Amino acid sequence: MQITSEIVNLIAAIMIFLGSIIALISSIGLIKFQDVFLRSHAATKSSTLSVLLTLVGVIIFFISSQGYLSVRLILALVFINLTSPVGGHLISRAAYRTGAYMYRKSDAPRQTNILLSSSENNTFEQLKQRAHEREERRRKTYEKEHDY
């Protein structure tokens, strides 16, 4: 029985450690990435996984060492895993609609070969023109915010 308890505690410690490592990687991504979309992606995807691993590790530890299941931890787990992706999506959506700057490596126009609207009345040239106008708005907004 003692060996089983030690193995379960080791599994819980490994999960907590992995959760903290993933949170560290997430924070590095927040510092390293250049625009709001990449930062939002780094914050929501990896922090959701890190919180999941950390809280599941804590739940396992409490069950094995204390012998009870914490309802607060389960509620925190559910709440964070529901609200973090939704919040990240809303931030990205608001940034996209306001024309926030999108980082890219090449100077080729973005989204010129992708349908940008579900309307069948738009021609390819109209969609291409709208993509170019959107890219110009984003570039001007970025330059205005960063005083270029």
Swiss-Prot record:
<protein>
    <recommendedName>
        <fullName>Putative antiporter subunit mnhG2</fullName>
    </recommendedName>
</protein>
<comment type="subunit">
    <text>May form a heterooligomeric complex that consists of seven subunits: mnhA2, mnhB2, mnhC2, mnhD2, mnhE2, mnhF2 and mnhG2.</text>
</comment>
<comment type="similarity">
    <text>Belongs to the CPA3 antiporters (TC 2.A.63) subunit G family.</text>
</comment>
<feature type="region of interest" description="Disordered">
    <location>
        <begin position="125"/>
        <end position="148"/>
    </location>
</feature>
<keyword id="KW-0813">Transport</keyword>
<feature type="transmembrane region" description="Helical">
    <location>
        <begin position="51"/>
        <end position="71"/>
    </location>
</feature>
<keyword id="KW-1133">Transmembrane helix</keyword>
<dbReference type="Pfam" id="PF03334">
    <property type="entry name" value="PhaG_MnhG_YufB"/>
</dbReference>
<keyword id="KW-0472">Membrane</keyword>
<keyword id="KW-0812">Transmembrane</keyword>
<feature type="transmembrane region" description="Helical">
    <location>
        <begin position="72"/>
        <end position="92"/>
    </location>
</feature>
<dbReference type="GO" id="GO:0005886">
    <property type="term" value="C:plasma membrane"/>
</dbReference>
<feature type="transmembrane region" description="Helical">
    <location>
        <begin position="11"/>
        <end position="31"/>
    </location>
</feature>
<keyword id="KW-1003">Cell membrane</keyword>
<feature type="compositionally biased region" description="Basic and acidic residues">
    <location>
        <begin position="127"/>
        <end position="148"/>
    </location>
</feature>
<dbReference type="InterPro" id="IPR005133">
    <property type="entry name" value="PhaG_MnhG_YufB"/>
</dbReference>
<keyword id="KW-0050">Antiport</keyword>
<keyword id="KW-0406">Ion transport</keyword>
<dbReference type="GO" id="GO:0015385">
    <property type="term" value="F:sodium:proton antiporter activity"/>
</dbReference>
